[in-house]
Design a protein with these regions (language model features):
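Structural motif
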Residues: 102, 152-159
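Acidic and generally charged, gly/proline-rich low-complexity regions
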Residues: 115, 159-160
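Glycine-rich active-site loops that engage anionic ligands at enzyme catalytic sites
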Residues: 100-150
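Electropositive, beta-rich accessory/interaction domains or terminal extensions
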Residues: 1-122, 167-178
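A structural micro-motif recognizing beta-strand termini
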Residues: 91-94, 147-151
């Protein structure tokens, strides 16, 4: 069982960071309470401002809270959840151990690792850490995406359970492709 610290959703809003012009983003996500329907495109109340930030193969963004430690010297206080705009903040799920095609149960749903996550400049702008995107990319600690195999309800207290491993003769980890 993989502990889920938070399942978060966001609404599109206009954000202003530093010298950047105002932008549309749903980067500021907050944990939902109770249960929510997860369909092929993601959590029904979650929004994405840009086409490449969602879709069938990027329905859920996942990031390990243990990876927040990469930035402990850059920030006065690390966030408790959704630091990088992820939907699932898990306690620890290392990109080297996460394989494309791995399937997990989350509540009533089945989700499958489907894509790498390429860090966005908006995260760098939010935290005013000049090398944040480069640091994430070079570390291989970028998070990843799930597609939804089986739709259903997810409760705020649900955890992830690995139910099917990717085929061993062809599997690639998220870290392999980062």
């Amino acid at each position: 069982m993989i502990k889920v610290n938070a399942i978060s959703i966001g609404k599109i809003e206009t954000l202003s960071y530093g010298n950047y012009k105002p932008m549309q983003s749903a980067l500021n996500k907050i944990p939902f309470k109770g249960q929510m329907w997860l369909n092929r495109l993601g959590f029904v109340d979650d929004e994405q401002a840009y086409h490449n930030h969602g879709g069938i193969h990027k329905a859920i963004c996942c990031f390990s809270k243990s990876n927040y430690q990469l930035f402990k010297d850059d920030l006065d206080q690390l966030p408790e959840f959704a630091m990088f705009g992820e939907n699932l903040t898990v306690e620890h799920l290392d990109e080297a151990d996460v394989y494309f095609g791995n399937q997990y149960q989350l509540g009533d749903t089945i989700i499958e690792v489907s894509d790498i996550r390429e860090p966005c400049w908006k995260i760098q702008a939010k935290y005013a850490i000049p090398n944040l995107v480069q640091k994430m990319s070079q570390s291989g600690k970028t998070g990843f995406y799930f597609r939804v195999i089986k739709e259903g309800y997810v409760h705020q207290s649900d955890n992830l359970k690995l139910i099917k491993k990717a085929e061993s003769n062809t599997r690639l980890s998220v870290k392999d492709l980062n």
